[in-house]
From Swiss-Prot:
GO terms for molecular function: serine-type endopeptidase inhibitor activity. It comes from Colinus virginianus. The record marks 18-19 as: Reactive bond 3. Residues 6-56 form the Kazal-like domain. This is Ovomucoid.
Length: 56
């Protein structure tokens, strides 16, 4: 079992590109890409984590 993680150190960003590379958050919500996910992580004060890559 390997921990799944994403480096969000350069976030938040004011605007995200529209590339579609889905990630599934610990809130069971599918995020369109790393940028959208990382912005949500920052907003959650680090309580949101990555569940897995791909749609939930």
């Amino acid at each position: 079992f390997a921990a799944v993680s994403v480096d969000c150190s350069e976030y938040p960003k004011p605007a995200c590109m529209s590339e579609y590379r889905p990630l599934c958050g610990s809130d069971n919500k599918t995020y369109v890409n790393k940028c959208n996910f990382c912005n949500a992580v920052v907003e959650s004060n680090g309580t949101l984590t990555l569940s897995h890559f791909g749609k939930c």
